[in-house]
Amino acid sequence: VVVVGYGTVKRRDLVGAVDQVDSKVFSERSNPSISRSLQGAIPNLNISMRDGKPSRAATINIRGTGSIGSGGGALVLIDGVEGDLETVNPQDIASVSVLKDASSAAIYGARGAFGVILVTTKSAEEGETKVTYNGSFSLHARTVKPQLVTDGYEWTTGYINAWNGYYNGQNPLPSYINNIAPYSDSWYKELARRSTDPSLERVRINDKNQYEYFANTDWMDAFYKDFNYSHEHNISVSGGNQNADYYVSGRFYDQDGIYRVGDERYKQYNVRAKGNIRIRPWLRLNNNMDFTVVDYHQPM
């Protein structure tokens, strides 16, 4: 069964460009949001992040950019109500359908001209009370780590060679490298001495009572970790009968930051409560409440 704009149909009876994934996509991936779990899961659903911050909202389009001006973002509906993918507990998802063709505009009008993403959350199942818990622990690593030149003598030698190669030795070296780092032949000689003899002091005070630093510091390694971790805990309770049913879930997600200095942490709390009560044979009362709190602290 596939969820479409006007209800549900069997996959064999489906007409139109619609793709759907079920809860397995989200149960196998530990991510702070649905959008990150959907990356690469549905054809022609393009999801990009400006950076790696866990709080960063995704840019979503279907089948490429649809508008030069507005960008052509897809309409996101969560249980029939327009919402934000970043605030939904991934473990609450029953299915996600993507409407890609013009039929979405016929149902939702101009707002659905660039496609529609239909998110259906889990509902209660009749029967005895069922309690479910799942948790995960994940390690995150950077895909690319820049290899920086940390040796001052090696860096300055490369700069001198590049300068002389460009000007063919016709122009003298500037007193400031890139208008930031001062240069002098005496400093260059001191860097050469410390490159060959690491036992020499890395910090000294000159005749003007100023500090001079000759340390070789890998600032990328000093500020950023090679790995950071996250852990997630989910619990849900559901049950009911033909007259009343309920589904209540809670989630705690905690991700450590990548900075070595400062207290960087991302925490997300989710609570969802769904219930149905049959008041009369012809009257049913439904409730669907979602509550999300995000606590994100970064040192800068």
Name the predicted role of every residue range:
Residues 294:
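Short edge-strand/loop segments of extracellular domains
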Residues 297-300:
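Outer-membrane beta-barrel translocator/channel fold
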